[in-house]
UniProtKB/Swiss-Prot annotation:
Entry keyword set: Cytoplasm, Metal-binding, NAD, Oxidoreductase, Zinc
Coiled-coil annotated spans: none
Family statement: Belongs to the zinc-containing alcohol dehydrogenase family. Class-III subfamily.
Protein name per Swiss-Prot or TrEMBL: Alcohol dehydrogenase class-3
Top-rank taxon, per record: Eukaryota
Compartments in which it is found: Cytoplasm
Binding site for Zn(2+) 2: C101, C104, C107, C115
UniProt main location, coarse: cytoplasm
Catalytic activity: a primary alcohol + NAD(+) = an aldehyde + NADH + H(+); a secondary alcohol + NAD(+) = a ketone + NADH + H(+); S-(hydroxymethyl)glutathione + NADP(+) = S-formylglutathione + NADPH + H(+); S-(hydroxymethyl)glutathione + NAD(+) = S-formylglutathione + NADH + H(+)
UniProt organism field: Oryza sativa subsp. japonica
Amino acid sequence: MASSTQGQVITCKAAVAWEANRPMTIEDVQVAPPQAGEVRVKILFTALCHTDHYTWSGKDPEGLFPCILGHEAAGIVESVGEGVTEVQPGDHVIPCYQAECRECKFCKSGKTNLCGKVRAATGVGVMMNDRKSRFSINGKPIYHFMGTSTFSQYTVVHDVSVAKINPQAPLDKVCLLGCGVSTGLGAVWNTAKVEAGSIVAIFGLGTVGLAVAEGAKSAGASRIIGIDIDSKKFDVAKNFGVTEFVNPKDHDKPIQQVIVDLTDGGVDYSFECIGNVSVMRSALECCHKGWGTSVIVGVAASGQEISTRPFQLVTGRVWKGTAFGGFKSRSQVPWLVEKYLNKEIKVDEYVTHSMNLTDINKAFDLLHEGGCLRCVLATDK
């Protein structure tokens, strides 16, 4: 069904980040029609993630201003460009910052969920076709972000960056499967491949850390140790599968030694869900000699480096990283939505606040106060 706006420029509301650390403002933005291989999506719900804040803060070397941030969302296809066959107007979709073209060296390798097709464009805030933005305000271009830009009532994405999902799924909930929840679950299931009976340590009990706990519980982990400097998070974490808690502030010894002592030599798997390089070292060094695996999930600030003694690795520990939990976006996000509909994974429980796009600055404040897991913004109000 063709929409009445197909082929036309749409003027809509979007939250524009004009410069680093300056509050975003709601603006009337012109969104151009999709070109070949592109999809224009009406965003209905978008959540906030720490990655959005990281770029907005000015610490991201790839951060470009002015831009429209946002990458965890859900909506409905408004129109498609030439050659787009996998989605059509009216389809319910989740935009995916991790593309999946199924044709590049990465996609064909069978070894990774990374995709090389559009990264050269999305990394600099433009679309592949003409290396230009589809967003503008009175003729002035506004950069895209992560190939998604979901803090807008309409966005344009590459067709390799959009997953068609079951229309029965509530978009205000499954939008979370566009980043945080999927990342945590996949870190356990795909990257670490945690087995039943394993002892797991999770550093950082935000949305991603709690999703790691949920994944570890479903994998049959025998002990799931949550580590956070905010003890208020511990009650909530129990609901996601965490069995015991450690606050590093309560101990004089280095946290890795505390965990090693608690676990008869170390954990089988650890997950760093903060993005702090010193914590990444602790997470590795609390792993058991001979077989312990540590997965870096959190994104550290640009230019920071990790370090440990080589002996840690020589004696059998493994250090790994994960992006989007190792999930192939277009193929597996629809599968995750089905798991949610079958009540096999939690999603609703991560949504602690619901607001409107116009409240975006207040929502970012909440994210930083620590009492908020995911705040979902409705764009149509």
